[in-house]
Amino acid sequence: MGANYSEIQELLQQRADIQARMNLMPYDGNPEIKVSNDARYLYMRKRVAGKLTSTYVDLYSDELYQLLLRNAKERKDLNKALRKINKELAVLGYEDKELSTRVLQNLDFARANMKANIYDQAVLEGVATTFPQTEDIIENRKVSGVSATDVQKILNLKHAWEFILDRDVIQSESNYHMLCHIAKLVNEGFFYDGGRIRGIPVQIGGTSYVPPLPVESAVIGQIEEIRSRDKDPIETAIELCMYCMKTQVFKDGNKRASVIFANHYLIAQGMGLLVIPEKDVPEFKKLLVRYYEGEPLEFIGTFLKEHCWKRF
């Protein structure tokens, strides 16, 4: 499988991305219209264990019916793409591997905490939502008083977290290409290719630090060097996170992508989660500015280990 490694990793990422997209879709099945007492109602029809089931959606409207039709077509296309990817993986000799019990437990731990993690990340980004609003957005429910931009950011965080929690993806290396794919998901809807390395100067608010333009080969090499050091997994995860933040690898979404990237590494080691809790965001931002401006990693690293490392 060695010669086909890159191709297999790309297919696995595509497969996990499709599965994450399908998880975001609110409806599964084909729409049908039922009439009762001169009123029309919309249902979703789906075959489960050989039996047809029908789930109520809402009162009929042309707009909702067209939405359900588009949803059904998109899901059908995604299922077709999944079958194609699985065939290609089989041709390349790929077989699904068993994950260790510890990693499986960590995946469950991450899924159980995903809503809280997304809310904490949203607070770090200045997204103005309450936890109940964030929860409604994650569950694809309607919310009021929240900007379309903030809704998109939260959905993108959900998409990125679901991506790294896929069993195939968690077995993939925490390398530059993984970071780029996470950034692409985080920036979806805001940039044409949010996972492309930054090619323009940027400034960071609240600090005199101006990150130089990143060089792709240098970023690839530094990530590999950090991963190869003989350190505890939490220390490696923190260093990966802080290096990517300070480097400002992408045009936007660097904090979001860096945290999720670090969690991809940490979960794969079965070592918990790394998320800045809402109450610790102000202190983290102060330490982050000091780190940007030259303070050694150990100061913010100690803070992250003591206040932001969730273990199970």
Where are the regions a protein language model picked out?
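FIC/Doc superfamily catalytic core
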Residues: 1-41, 47-312
